[in-house]
Amino acid sequence: MKRTERHHLKEDEMATGVHWLVQFFRSYQREIYIVAGAVVFAAVVFSGLMAIRSRARSVQSAAVGQVTALAAEIEQTPAKLADLEKLAAGGRTARLATLELARYWAEKSDWAKADSYLVKIPAGPKDLLYYQAEDLKGQVALARKDYDKAIGIYKKITDEKPKAYPLDAALFGLAQSQEAKGETAAAIETYQKLQADFPQTYYGYEASLRAGKLEIRK
């Protein structure tokens, strides 16, 4: 008997619950449809944005690959320079193509030509490519014996401490520039800082050797 009563009680509770849900749905039917529609719309928009971003990354990757391939080919096929020039004229990969052209001429020791491309690279965003261009500017200035300019470039990089670029490379460029200018004490200090902060890197090891040689010359 008690089991039957409990069974009926559960049925009544279930019926009450279902009735409450039906009443709730009827009372807030419009609001529920609006919320559901908003959720569906948001899901569609999110999916669309993800698809667009994926497509953009794919296009960007292909464009970067094209620039990289051309940069590798121009050493053997100088005629490809014209194709790289076209990519440097504008578009997604203009900065990268311009940097590759600057590198090409720097490797040929045509510092003026390299500089003519480096000045075309925008001052931002301050990403890896930006600091690669700044480093190359420092190398070109050092090769042209414009030591003050080189020191200024490398000091700016080291002061900014960018996460996008290896600080040991910038410190090494700074120390080289100071050494070339004859600022021996400053160069030794920079080499020693590099050695202390980056002992396990190539530049840290090279800095220890150069600092030792400069100490002997003093």
Which sequence ranges carry the predicted segments?
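Acidic, polar-rich low-complexity tracts and alpha-helical solenoid repeat scaffolds
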Residues: 1-218
